[in-house]
Amino acid sequence: PSFISVFSNIFSGTAATGGFLGATVVWAFNRGVNRGLFSNEAGQGSAPIAHAAAKTEEPVSEGMVALLEPFIDTIVICSITGLVLLSSGTWLKKFENKFQQADTVVLSGAYHESDPDGKSAVSEHVLGNKPLPFYTGSLEVRNGQILNTDITLLHARSFADSVRVKEGKEVLFSGTLSVRDGRIELPMNKERAVYLTGKSLLHSAPLSTEAFKKGFLGDWGQFIIPFSLLLFAFSTTIAWSYYGDRAVTYLWGTKYVRIYHVIYIVGFFLASFTDTTIVWTLSGITVALMTLPNLIGILLLHKEVKSSVNEYWRRMKEKL
């Protein structure tokens, strides 16, 4: 069924099913390539830093080993994750969750998911085809409930349902919230931070967590993602620290490595409580900044690479 849904729905426009708004082939392709490049680091020049440290007499053979990494990262791991999401059906369902501020948008005007015209209008807005006006003003909140009736609240590209405004530890908020160009300006009080909860679609790790809970492990399945992320984060932290260490040493010398380490640690601290949408956006920008100069270098050295590969295969054929 998972494979069938991939091919049967690719051009069918079932994007609005279950509240999932604005998902087309172009959008899915864009996100797929984006996440794929982020997962396997293709063309970014990071893996060669690690492979350059390997003790080998043949650089081409080391390159062949490196080719296996994108296959495992993208084709195997990402495909399995996608099939888990499709087979579980969680990608179409709304779950109770804490809204991320960067994923929350307030539209001017009341649009309802039960109304086909309203749903279509919001879907076109999410796609960027026919933008709807963003709301600017104030939201009146009483006992956690937003009293304004002339707005539409979206979260994670879906209609937000059963929205409640809370502060501190699950205390219902009463007061006024400012909204500017569709973005809610939440008070950032350290002891009583204001936030929104409700039902909406999920993405990233929370979506995968819900999907694994639908498997034969039941609620125990939710621990697969945190454990996997722990291992991934630990290995990524070490690897990228080494990559940056080598790059800084090459560009400016060893005396600047300590400064790099401090910036690196501060970056991890800030990212730990930043909305994942912001993190994904920043990662996309930095990936482009890494990839462009590296691809230029590959183009300039393509003759040398081709010559080395041809010589490698010639020697391999002679051995056979």
Annotated model-derived regions:
Residues 1-31:
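Helix-loop-helix hairpins and the membrane-proximal interhelical loops
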Residues 28, 32-36, 67-70, 195, ...:
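Hydrophobic alpha-helical transmembrane segments of multi-pass small-molecule transporters/permeases
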Residues 1-2, 83-95, 182-183, 201-225, ...:
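Transmembrane helix-loop junctions in multi-pass membrane proteins
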Residues 23, 30, 256-259, 263-310, ...:
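A generic transmembrane alpha-helix motif of multi-pass inner-membrane proteins
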Residues 134, 138-146, 150-172, 177, ...:
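C-terminal membrane-solvent junction of multi-pass transporters and transport-like membrane proteins
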Residues 1, 59-89, 260-268:
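Selective recognition of specific alpha-helical transmembrane segments in multi-pass small-molecule
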Residues 36-41, 46-59, 65-70, 86:
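Helix-loop junctions at the membrane interface of multi-pass solute transporters
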Residues 88-216:
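Low-complexity, proline/glycine-enriched hydrophobic segments characteristic of transmembrane helices
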